[in-house]
Amino acid sequence: TKCYVTPDVKSETCPAGQDICYTETWCDAWCTSRGKRVDLGCAATCPIVKPGVEIKCCSTDNCNPFPTWRKRP
């Protein structure tokens, strides 16, 4: 499987046994001015969701592009 991986947000072949791509987003102290933090990568299983963290998992090549945020009006 190939997934986008941060920090460079470039497509990389996942290590053996890691066939899941994930997109993890969460708020930190700068969330209101910079938007949510984003972490992209490969995993063997979909990571456990923690409070305040949103995780999306998928299993096709490059299915985890960097999220596009809507501008606030």
Swiss-Prot record:
Keywords: Acetylcholine receptor inhibiting toxin, Disulfide bond, Ion channel impairing toxin, Neurotoxin, Postsynaptic neurotoxin, Secreted, Toxin. InterPro entries: Snake_3FTx, Snake_toxin-like_sf, Snake_toxin_con_site, Toxin_cobra-type. Pfam families: Toxin_cobra-type. One of its GO terms (cellular component) is extracellular region. Belongs to the three-finger toxin family. Long-chain subfamily. Type II alpha-neurotoxin sub-subfamily. Expressed by the venom gland. Gene3D superfamilies: CD59. This is Long neurotoxin 1. It comes from Ophiophagus hannah (King cobra). GO terms for molecular function: acetylcholine receptor inhibitor activity; ion channel regulator activity; toxin activity. Disulfide bonds join 3-21, 14-42, 27-31, 46-57, 58-63. Binds with high affinity to muscular (alpha-1/CHRNA1) and neuronal (alpha-7/CHRNA7) nicotinic acetylcholine receptor (nAChR) and inhibits acetylcholine from binding to the receptor, thereby impairing neuromuscular and neuronal transmission. It is found in: Secreted.
